[in-house]
């Protein structure tokens, strides 16, 4: 499972609710929030699965 985060970080994210579970066992509200976290983690954060953790 992977997500293309090449267009991130974004300064603002929508409130769209499409949860993504990260490899840190944290649930992100949507792809934008997840990808911003990936950038902050220098690429160490990955997708565990889609949906809540």
Swiss-Prot record:
Q: Where in the cell is it found?
A: Secreted
Notes concerning its domains: Avian ovomucoid consists of three homologous, tandem Kazal family inhibitory domains.
Q: Which organism is it from?
A: Polyplectron bicalcaratum (Grey peacock-pheasant)
Which residues does this entry assign to the site Reactive bond 3? 15-16
Which cysteine pairs are covalently linked by disulfides here? 5-35, 13-32, 21-53
Q: Where is the Kazal-like domain?
A: 3-53
Keyword annotations? Disulfide bond, Glycoprotein, Protease inhibitor, Repeat, Secreted, Serine protease inhibitor
Domain of life from the UniProt record = Eukaryota
What GO MF annotations does this protein's record show? serine-type endopeptidase inhibitor activity
What protein name applies here?
Ovomucoid
InterPro entries documented for this protein: Bifunctional_prot_inhibitor, Kazal_dom, Kazal_dom_sf
The organism's taxonomic lineage, starting at the top: Eukaryota, Metazoa, Chordata, Craniata, Vertebrata
GO cellular component terms given for this protein: extracellular space
Report the glycosylation sites: 42
Q: Which SUPFAM superfamilies match?
A: Kazal-type serine protease inhibitors
